[in-house]
Amino acid sequence: MGQYYKIVNLDKQEFLDTYTFNDGAKLLEFGCNSEGTLTALAILLADGNGRGGGDLHSENPIIGSWAGDRIVVIGDYADEQKFLTVDQIAKHKMLKDGEDPNLYDHAVEHFKDVSEKALIAMLDDQFIYQVYEKAD
């Protein structure tokens, strides 16, 4: 088995799901791959994109939308309650018979998955588009 991860934006309450990018969910499955999850993360964090060679030339508003936010690469074995607010913990406990939440489970249940939006922006790049076209 092993631990599975998601990339979570605490401020926007959004996350990236590695499977959308044809990556595995274990840390080194997506951490060592190119044109996948970490490219999506770079696009979301990019501040000033589109001003030079090597940038993603797209007007997609998701580009840079995570710049400056608190981001966590969180595993499903993560510490309970860590990174969650008191209100988030209380809500979870109320809905789950007192069970302590972790951020991974909370994000899956309550945050927005922006993986497809990030992938659409990535596909504006011809090279990345060709990589995904070959994979299908």
Region spans (language model):
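Low-complexity intrinsically disordered segments
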Residues: 26-136
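Short, extreme N-terminal segment that most often corresponds to the first beta-strand
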Residues: 1-22
